[in-house]
């Protein structure tokens, strides 16, 4: 079904809400049922083991002790380890067995091996094209070391000759994306966490169909959870019938596995290797305020033109090739990227993988906080952080740096809002300023520091983004649009309510209790 609505573009799905009966007997209902049956089986096996092991009391103690020693000596976040220890103390045998199950997941190992291989191949693809690292070392050796770390952790070097445009709202990004898509001559790559039919996606899809008819290669990669939340399991087939290559990343199957914990949270658009977009804006109407869900939706994005676009081209191709035997990077990187020779500064696109052991997203944020001299201004939808990030925020403020966070005034997830408030008191005590955006929901992921550094991307200050998602961002140094980012922060701040210890005390008791309980298991959520 290909419907067109006036001014809203194409639709591939029928409008209408599904009733309870349809939901129960849908593919999602079947998968949920199979999940529950498998969980019931696992719980039964664990319960049987729990009943059997007490007959060998000494064996139970030794078994738990071995698991605890292994946990304490393994790599990982100390807060997460503490959470597991609490779990062990509440349910000793079940907790230990469940921990072993999550650690032995085969899907995780296969994903890690494949991403490592792709990074190795990608490093050779971009090495010959980047010469900015030496210039950065001459400009700022400390930041050059961070760039070297990012290049070593992944395969994305620092670039010069790249113009960056900052969009303070999703509507602004959308207005720039449409003409960029219409100008495509060779290829269009779209990678998004959420795609939902409506005005935004409808207009984009209409352009993609026209471009396919003109011989442009179009690829769309969507996170697999969209099959249940916004699209249908056969949506890739519907797209392919239109000539658009479409994939779901890690589609959810009816098998219990921690493999599904790793989601593709990135938002990338690349056109002909000349233009790239990233930021918090997905392809759904709430991101451009055509649909109001949590008040005004405040989001941000950037558009790159110039050499750094090559990194986003490779970033997309790496993710596309995860379930394939070969990667076609050389064919698309062969298209010459036009450098913007008069564009000052440095741009460093980077990605963060949950399976390689390098927490690049968190390290870049901490690096900015540790280097700042005057201010670090942050916009984030969530604040569910580990000890390292909390300490970095506190230490920067205690050094006299103006550390100021803007969070939502109207949350999209009440549990996340409760968890965020559990961090407020300790941060404010150290001098960190926190404000909440009263008109609605902040979905922006922005760091800006000292009028010369900034990050705009997809990386939230929460465990999901920092530990469990595939993410991406653009780091900028001495780029003119950094002034626009700081100006937007100040403009947004005027619409915020400053949080104080007194206001925090007025939180509802239910919110305080929920936050305290959830904080104990936050790393496992």
Which positions does each model-derived feature cover?
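A short, conserved beta-strand element enriched in hydrophobic/aromatic residues
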Residues: 299, 379-380
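Glycine- and other small-residue-rich loops at beta-strand/loop junctions that grip anionic moieties
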Residues: 193, 381-382, 416
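Helical hairpin unit composed of two closely spaced alpha helices linked by a short loop
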Residues: 372, 382-404, 408, 413
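Extended hydrophobic-aromatic, low-complexity segments
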Residues: 386-390, 404-406, 414-418, 436-437, ...
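N-terminal localization/anchoring segments of enzymes in phospholipid and broader phosphate metabolism
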Residues: 2-363, 367, 371, 395, ...
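A beta-strand-loop signature enriched in Asp, Gly, Thr, and Trp
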Residues: 399, 404-449
